[in-house]
Amino acid sequence: MSTKPTIAFTHLGCEKNRIDTEHIIGLLVQAGYEVDANEELADYVVVNTCSFIQAAREESVKTLVELAEANKKIVIAGCMAQHFPEELLAELPEAIALVGTGDYHKIVDVMQRVEKGDRVKEVTAEPTYIADETTPRYRTTSEGVAYVRIAEGCDYRCAFCIIPHLRGKARSRTIESIVVEAQKLADQGVKEIILISQITTNYGIDIYGQPKLADLLEALGKVDIPWIRMHYAYPTGLTPKVITAIQDTPNILPYLDLPLQHSHPEILRAMNRPWQGQVNDDIIKRIKTAMPNAVLRTSFIVGFPGETEEHHSHLVEFVKRHEFDHVGVFTFSPEEGTPAYNLPNQLPQEVMDARRQEIMEVQQSISWQQNQKLVGQLVDVLIEQENPQTGELIGRSPRFSPEVDGLIYVKGEARLGCIVPVMITDADIYDLYGCLISSAA
């Protein structure tokens, strides 16, 4: 019987944080620690926090306070530990350790020191670490899906973004390392991997001297995983070579997540993305011409300091004109330590909320129309869940990425983690409904 303490985990934030959590769990399990989903039964709770914007920090703080009030011993990991180490130690006596974004591979040593009674701060000022295929990992996603981090950190300095401070400079894994990990996941039965980094299209610059995303996609084309999806493709990095690699590699989904942030050149200049304003329309046109079946997701920030009604109207028309498949809209969050924090002409929250709502309503109409086109079509669906009450299956098609896009509700019988043909019979703004064509899956 194990004499090691039991540890529970709470994960907050993005899928990059999720991968960090999975490595933390993997390392602790390898070292003999017990992991329990029940925080009440655990000796320690590791909270992997998010600090990207104010709302994320508030969620992280709420979670930490609730655990502190329950007298839990807390290990704070992730972006808040990186961002506010001294404040957290001062204000939360229950925090017995802090682990920064570049230090989670030291978690076993941290826990051993904690067990001896130490209060530990393991936070490297500028993170440089990136896990690879040799780092233990315990996946927390559904059995058919896995995220694969191809790079970490960011060298861009967008005026609104705190990520370079939280995650460090850009650093990539080798193509060989990523392919080995993908093959391991294929051997485990994974059907979809999602490639992530801060800027996926900049992959490889630091180790190869030039972007190597196209070469990576071609190499991953030899791995037996049916769906490979990319997130965070910076628009100017979608070169003809990358687009050709997507076209020519059958298991690379024509799904592009483009964090455009805005459409108006003046706002993009203020955001320190000056080159983007002149190319947004051209890049989208090039993608749609080369890949008429491409699924486009993007995200925008409304209410950036100085954004006028004219700037906002430009963005609304941009959304109408391009008819994106999926859109996320965020109100500007002033982040201390970023250039945008002290910019003049900050907008009231109610103005930002109204602008966000307007774009969301425009996009909802577009999304509804896009989904209606799929009624009567046969699509491949990766089955991920089963509703225990109704027996209804829940999954996604290539046009839906996990967490951020819609779902497909399926009538029929199939194994979890397999891809099956589904006839779409109905659709709403975000989700699709259908019937399994064959129950032989």
From Swiss-Prot:
What is a biological process (GO) this protein takes part in? tRNA modification
Question: Main localization of the protein?
Answer: cytoplasm
Q: Which GO terms describe its molecular function?
A: 4 iron, 4 sulfur cluster binding; aspartic acid methylthiotransferase activity; metal ion binding; protein methylthiotransferase activity
Q: Which domain of life is it from?
A: Bacteria
Q: Which residues form the TRAM domain?
A: 372-438
Q: Which UniProt keywords apply?
A: 4Fe-4S, Cytoplasm, Iron, Iron-sulfur, Metal-binding, S-adenosyl-L-methionine, Transferase
**Which part of the chain is the MTTase N-terminal domain?**
5-116
Question: Per the database record, which ranges form the Radical SAM core domain?
Answer: 140-370
* SUPFAM superfamilies, per the entry: Radical SAM enzymes
Binding site residues for [4Fe-4S] cluster 2: 154, 158, 161
Q: Does the record's keyword annotation contain S-adenosyl-L-methionine? A: yes
Q: Which reaction does it catalyse?
A: L-aspartate(89)-[ribosomal protein uS12]-hydrogen + (sulfur carrier)-SH + AH2 + 2 S-adenosyl-L-methionine = 3-methylsulfanyl-L-aspartate(89)-[ribosomal protein uS12]-hydrogen + (sulfur carrier)-H + 5'-deoxyadenosine + L-methionine + A + S-adenosyl-L-homocysteine + 2 H(+)
Cofactor binding, note field: Binds 2 [4Fe-4S] clusters. One cluster is coordinated with 3 cysteines and an exchangeable S-adenosyl-L-methionine.
**Any Pfam family:** Radical_SAM
GO CC annotation terms, alphabetical: cytosol
Residues bound to [4Fe-4S] cluster 1: 14, 50, 79
On whether Ribosomal protein is a keyword of this UniProt record, the answer is no
What this chain does, per the record? Catalyzes the methylthiolation of an aspartic acid residue of ribosomal protein uS12.
**What's this protein's family per the entry?**
Belongs to the methylthiotransferase family. RimO subfamily.
Name of the protein in question? Ribosomal protein uS12 methylthiotransferase RimO
* Gene from which this protein is expressed: rimO
